[in-house]
């Protein structure tokens, strides 16, 4: 009996996870769906994660953990003005919407939608992934093993 319960529980969890998975689609389907997102207003966005990058032989780390933004008069404002680089990077990410994605005709980009939106692009053995919720708000940005996530509060 316990085995049957575990089996049905596992089957149920699998069905739930498959129901909320992204579905690969064409660019036209992706952009059409992205233009029809429902409107919701979040009042707070909190970032987590680090972005490590190298330029001209110098490695830098941008730690976004704990960086917060509040929405005032329709615009995102950084909660800590002492984190200038995090504030600028965060504002750019908060403004990035799925409807802003341009079509990549090289075949290196895949588009997904269903329970939110996702774009996955691979070039020079480096993969970048952007994910948005159903309302078009960025929830995750990954590049070359670095991931920055955003959580929202209404």
Where are the regions that the model predicts?
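N-terminal compositionally biased, intrinsically disordered segments and leader/signal-like regions
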Residues: 15, 27, 44-47, 60-62, ...
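N-terminal leader/targeting segments and the immediate start of mature chains
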Residues: 15-50, 91-94, 105, 115, ...
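Intrinsically disordered, low-complexity segments enriched in Ser/Pro/Gly/Ala and basic residues
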Residues: 16-19, 32, 38, 59, ...
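Serine/proline-rich low-complexity intrinsically disordered segments, especially terminal tails, linkers
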Residues: 16-22, 41, 50, 62, ...
